[in-house]
Amino acid sequence: MSKRIRLGIVGLSADPSHCTNYIHKIPLTTTPLKEKYEITAVSMSSPEKAEAAAIAHGLPRERGYHSVESLAKDPDVDLVVVSVKVPRRAELAMAAIEAGKDVYVEWPFASNLAAAEALAQRARERQVKSMVGLPTRLAPQVLKMKEILRSGSLGRILATNLLVTDDLFLKFHADKRHSHDKTNGANIVTIAGGHLLDAMAFLLGEFTTLHAHTSMLFPKPVLCDTDGNLKTGQFNDSPDTFTMHGKIGISEVPVSVCMYSHPPTTPNLFQWVITGEKGSLKMEGPSLMIHAIPPKLMMTSFGSETVCWEEISLENTIVSGAEYQAWLDNDTERIVTLDEAVVRYRMVDAILRSAESGQCTSYRYD
């Protein structure tokens, strides 16, 4: 067996219910990826948590670090994975880069465009490889849509529209309250918008012009304690709703986006339609997290007596750890580097600037 890539995961705690366990450890240890990767170190915020995490994941106690600097200096770590709350991602990823280690950091990885640009620049200077966690573009449904679009079977693309309604940003656990402080850059625009609009740009090209509006419908959101009990939240100054229209790609296809939060009194909905002259595609499901909770993919075609949506059968509806496979394959189309992710931050910045000014705007994506 060839040498496996050795991972040091920042934020992989002893708690098996923590999201880092689902996003990283499970696909790395329960799929064919386990033959290509191994977890050799973890890092947590205190010595006690670091030691507990190391023991929980079958590592020697000394492989539980309480600083990223120490983890990154470990000669048995090839790739540092940063999976912590948004406000600290850039700082911790920078520590790995300064140590000369390749880095995988989740999206969003910075609180603003300037911080994202600084991290990408330092990665270039240190000549390290990087990957940003934008797995929505790797969902089997999105890749199938790309295949169909490339085939030309839809004909000329006339428009695309995306509708997302979700209670996710109102029912965060109390430890996610940082998302309600706009300075942290962790809100419906950066998180839901960043992931889903990245997939849209992956299929159709970058937005050539956009006009956005954001609002805050719930200034005091509902939070849950660790037992799931509802409790009153702190005051919110982050947007919980945004809409956008504009044009996308070299053909300047009209685009409409609506993402809004609602209480759990209404079912969640994800719906994305790409309308073509010869046929159309529709993705529809119960969650905006389409890479984890799979939507149905449907297609219709022109020329039949009765036009209706027909579901497309996929061999797999979820591919756990798809970004890790892309890293192994050195798949430059599916891997999003820090430099490429800066373009997504420019898009987010343009959305927020447009919402503040009320004016149509654009961003640089060369």
From Swiss-Prot:
Q: Which residues cross the membrane?
A: none
Q: What is its EC number?
A: 1.-.-.-
Does the keyword Oxidoreductase feature in the UniProt annotation? yes
| UniProt cross-references to Pfam families, sorted A to Z | Gal80p_C-like, GFO_IDH_MocA
Extract the InterPro entries matched here: Gal80p-like_C, Gfo/Idh/MocA-like_OxRdtase_N, Gfo/Idh/MocA_oxidoreduct, NAD(P)-bd_dom_sf
Q: In which pathway does it act?
A: Mycotoxin biosynthesis
Q: Where is the signal peptide?
A: 1-19
Q: Which GO terms describe its molecular function?
A: nucleotide binding; oxidoreductase activity
Residues carrying a glycan: N330
What biological function has been recorded for the protein in this entry? Answer: Dehydrogenase; part of the gene cluster that mediates the biosynthesis of aspirochlorine (or antibiotic A30641), an unusual halogenated spiro compound with distinctive antifungal properties due to selective inhibition of protein biosynthesis, and which is also active against bacteria, viruses, and murine tumor cells. The non-ribosomal peptide synthetase (NRPS) aclP is responsible the formation of the diketopiperazine (DKP) core from the condensation of 2 phenylalanine residues.
**Name the UniProt record assigns to this protein:** Dehydrogenase aclE
Q: Which organism is it from?
A: Aspergillus oryzae (strain ATCC 42149 / RIB 40) (Yellow koji mold)
